[in-house]
């Protein structure tokens, strides 16, 4: 017998599907961050709403309440670790001020583009999906991967990638072989 997982939904569609201001805002974000569809924005929205809901709940508790101390420090550690908040912003009030672009800035696709490994955000998405990008020697093929601050400096081309130290791509190999045959074949005929 097989164990079935009941996965919860990770995104929530907007209540009003044709709200012009929201549609324009989402389209601008899709273009700016190279997103595939608006569902990626909705997924970030849901993550953000869960974090904000927890922060609001914790802010209603007294400051020395054990639950507020434990869960509040966990949320702040997570926000600092992923780079959503700066290290000097260490209060739960700052979690309420987080926005969707704050989280979209930490996606692997955006970070690869910001580091100059790709010509555009769309190019960085292609590089990631084609297994050219590695985070700390581990190839990552998910453009929506949230990059930690500690692993941000370890983003580079994969060792097996033609952009890195791997063997050259098909076109370069064909040209190299043609050049070898052209120079080597001419000597044999004479």
Curated annotation (Swiss-Prot):
**Matches recorded under Gene3D superfamilies:** RNA-binding S4 domain
- Annotated segments matching region Disordered: 166-190
Cited SUPFAM superfamilies = Alpha-L RNA-binding motif
Q: Where is the signal peptide?
A: none
For this UniProt record, give its keywords in alphabetical order, as a comma-separated list: Ribonucleoprotein, Ribosomal protein, RNA-binding, rRNA-binding
Q: Which GO terms describe its molecular function?
A: RNA binding; rRNA binding; structural constituent of ribosome
**What Pfam families has UniProt attached to this entry?**
Ribosomal_S4, S4
Q: Is Transferase given among the entry's keywords?
A: no
Basic residues bias: where? 169-179
- Family, per the entry? Belongs to the universal ribosomal protein uS4 family.
Spell out the protein name for this chain: Small ribosomal subunit protein uS4
């Amino acid at each position: 017998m097989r164990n079935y997982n009941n996965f919860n939904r990770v995104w929530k569609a907007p209540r009003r599907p044709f709200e012009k201001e929201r549609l324009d805002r989402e389209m601008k974000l899709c273009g700016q961050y190279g997103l595939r569809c608006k569902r990626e924005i909705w997924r970030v929205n849901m993550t953000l709403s869960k974090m904000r809901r927890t922060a609001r709940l914790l802010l209603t508790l007294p400051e020395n309440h054990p639950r507020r101390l434990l869960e509040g420090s966990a949320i702040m550690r997570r926000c600092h670790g992923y780079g959503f908040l700066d290290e000097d912003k260490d209060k739960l009030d700052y979690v309420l001020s987080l926005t969707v672009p704050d989280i979209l800035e930490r996606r692997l696709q955006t970070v690869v583009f910001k580091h100059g490994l790709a010509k555009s955000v769309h190019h960085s998405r292609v590089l990631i999906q084609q297994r050219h990008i590695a985070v700390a020697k581990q190839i990552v093929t998910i453009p929506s991967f949230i990059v930690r601050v500690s692993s941000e400096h370890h983003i580079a081309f994969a060792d097996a990638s033609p952009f890195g130290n791997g063997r050259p791509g098909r076109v370069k190999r064909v040209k190299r072989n043609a050049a070898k045959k052209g120079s080597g074949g001419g000597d044999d005929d004479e």
